[in-house]
Amino acid sequence: MDQYCILGRIGEGAHGIVFKAKHVETGEIVALKKVALRRLEDGFPNQALREIKALQEMGDNQYVVQLKAVFPHGGGFVLAFEFMLSDLAEVVRHAQRPLAQAQVKSYLQMLLKGVAFCHANNIVHRDLKPANLLISASGQLKIADFGLARVFSPDGSRLYTHQVATRSSLSCRTTTRSPLRSRCPCPWRRCCLTSLPRHWICWVNSFSTLLTSASQLPRLSSISTSSQLPCLPIHLSCRFLSV
């Protein structure tokens, strides 16, 4: 850590704290994710290992956040990423007015190119959401947080876990016990991402073919109850809220 000067705290995730830092020699601004090891015998957390492996296997790409270095520090280790000014969730949340169509198209194009690059390298992200889409000062969008990523089996022989992150953007296929033998969750999440802000809803129709069926579109805005989903898989079980 001696080669970096901490400039401030960016945030905190499930497995570590993220700091904004400056490389002492080069002056480069980076984001440092400090991951502490709870017990030495447990070794590296699986999510951190997956993220490192996925980013190293894919290499550099303008639509995927760059991992610059990994090094031990104290009772844990540090991942050094290129610094990005914000994320899509913050951009939408603090927008004074609806985003221009040209800006929406630009973000969506960069997202799709990033996902295409991941899939071309047999990497399935499995946790696409606005908070994991980082935005640079120049407006460049990059996919980040590959902690739930998996190496995809082209022949479809590998069965994947249902634990594919955020419940609010889980695909219909995932919630109905269907085996995850394909890249299915990513197309669904791309549609969920474009439907989040109200002024983005029009873009969902353009990508309806990415869903299992166009007839599923009206259900995106509906609220499910326990009677409508009596056989919800155990890995997704939770108490339904009264509305």
Swiss-Prot record:
Transmembrane segments: none annotated. The active site is at residue 127. One of its GO terms (biological process) is cell division. Gene3D superfamilies: Phosphorylase Kinase, domain 1, Transferase(Phosphotransferase) domain 1. It holds the Pfam family Pkinase. GO terms for molecular function: ATP binding; cyclin-dependent protein serine/threonine kinase activity; protein serine kinase activity; protein serine/threonine kinase activity. SMART domains: S_TKc. It is an enzyme of class 2 (transferase). Its EC number is 2.7.11.22. Residues 4-243 form the Protein kinase domain. GO terms for cellular component: cilium; cytoplasm; nucleus. Required for high-level Shh responses in the developing neural tube. Together with TBC1D32, controls the structure of the primary cilium by coordinating assembly of the ciliary membrane and axoneme, allowing GLI2 to be properly activated in response to SHH signaling. Involved in cell growth. Activates CDK2, a kinase involved in the control of the cell cycle, by phosphorylating residue 'Thr-160'. Monomer. Interacts with TBC1D32 and MAK. This is Cyclin-dependent kinase 20. The gene is CDK20.
